[in-house]
């Protein structure tokens, strides 16, 4: 009886250990480190470091055509350069990350002070934007990105842009 119980306990322990190991993503730490590094590059403006983390043909689904018409890594570098010029004191905090397969999900908050007029905001305006990023990796490099901004932050930015403006214009008077 004792041998059967000991054997059952050993098999159960082995099963638990194997199932825990098989569900672990071996790339998780690498993907998280790359995501933190890329956010640090956005803050520092050292765009040449992006080559280490982002594929040359990467697709950013959040690319703003008013900033650049370039695609891939070249376009991403232009966007990073643009935002670093506008917000030279940008500080991004990564609050949470999760990895599922080849996809990383990150929750961040970025704060910076505009060095020049930006989207209707005067220079010197401080702005905080919270966002969720979805990043797909292939061959240890980021190949796709979607960014979703917190709409309450967007509304605050829009309201600060409209300060002093009349929201309803009476053309009859």
Task: Please report, for each region that a protein language model flagged, where it lies by residue.
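C-terminal and inter-domain tail/linker signature
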Residues: 20-173
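Hydrophobic residues within membrane-embedded alpha helices
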Residues: 6-7, 82
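General helical structural elements
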Residues: 7-8, 34
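Bacterial N-terminal signal peptides
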Residues: 8-17
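Positively charged n-region of N-terminal signal peptides that target proteins for export
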Residues: 1-5
């Amino acid at each position: 009886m004792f041998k059967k119980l000991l054997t059952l306990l050993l098999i159960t322990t082995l099963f638990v250990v194997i199932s825990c190991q098989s569900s672990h993503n071996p790339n998780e730490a690498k993907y998280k480190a790359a995501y933190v590094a890329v956010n640090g590059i956005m803050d520092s403006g050292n765009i040449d470091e992006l080559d280490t983390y982002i594929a040359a043909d990467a697709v950013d689904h959040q690319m703003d055509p008013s900033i650049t018409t370039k695609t891939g890594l070249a376009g991403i570098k232009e966007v990073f350069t643009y935002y670093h010029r506008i917000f030279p004191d940008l500080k991004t905090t990564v609050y949470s990350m999760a990895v599922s397969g080849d996809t990383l999900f990150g929750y961040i908050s970025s704060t910076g002070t505009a060095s020049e007029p930006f989207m209707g905001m005067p220079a010197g305006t401080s702005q905080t934007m919270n966002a969720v990023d979805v990043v797909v990796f292939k061959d240890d490099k980021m190949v796709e990105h979607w960014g979703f901004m917190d709409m309450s932050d967007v509304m605050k930015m829009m309201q600060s842009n409209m300060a002093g403006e009349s929201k309803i214009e009476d053309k009859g008077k």
